Curated annotation (Swiss-Prot):
Entry superkingdom: Bacteria
GO biological process, one term: translation
Native organism taxonomy: Bacteria, Pseudomonadati, Bacteroidota, Flavobacteriia, Flavobacteriales
Protein name per its UniProtKB record: Large ribosomal subunit protein uL11
PANTHER family: 60S RIBOSOMAL PROTEIN L12 (PTHR11661), LARGE RIBOSOMAL SUBUNIT PROTEIN UL11M (PTHR11661:SF1)
Subunit structure: Part of the ribosomal stalk of the 50S ribosomal subunit. Interacts with L10 and the large rRNA to form the base of the stalk. L10 forms an elongated spine to which L12 dimers bind in a sequential fashion forming a multimeric L10(L12)X complex.
Coiled coil: none
Gene3D superfamilies reported in the protein's UniProt record: Ribosomal protein L11, C-terminal domain (1.10.10.250), Ribosomal protein L11/L12, N-terminal domain (3.30.1550.10)
Disulfide-linked positions: none
Amino acid sequence: MAKEVSKVVKLQVRGGAANPSPPVGPALGAAGVNIMEFCKQFNGRTQDKQGKVLPVAITVYKDKSFDFVIKTPPAAVQLMEAAKTKKGSGEPNRKKVASVSWDQVKAIAEDKMQDLNAFTVESAMKMVAGTARSMGITVKGDAPF
């Protein structure tokens, strides 16, 4: 018989850097999870992604056991890395802060494909391009589709 789910906690934590301080500690403490056990497991599974922001969904069961799924870094973070900028624009419709190529958008879309609800790479590229547009990052060139 399957375990009964008590709570699902969603966080964004840097790879290999989970520790009991906020935001991880309070969120997991309120759910009744052994915080140090989560930190050890998370840091062990994300050693190869040191420093990258990773969304994680932690499923907490009634018996206080847990499991978690690590997703790919957010598209916004990947776009900022590709554009070599620290943050998006405060006024994306007026002030553009950087630009990326369609090849970079395609690489990000292929990386994010498992987490997006898109069936084709082209539709995933459109989602990533929309994220870029809302951040004040322009996509250079004509769309390849």
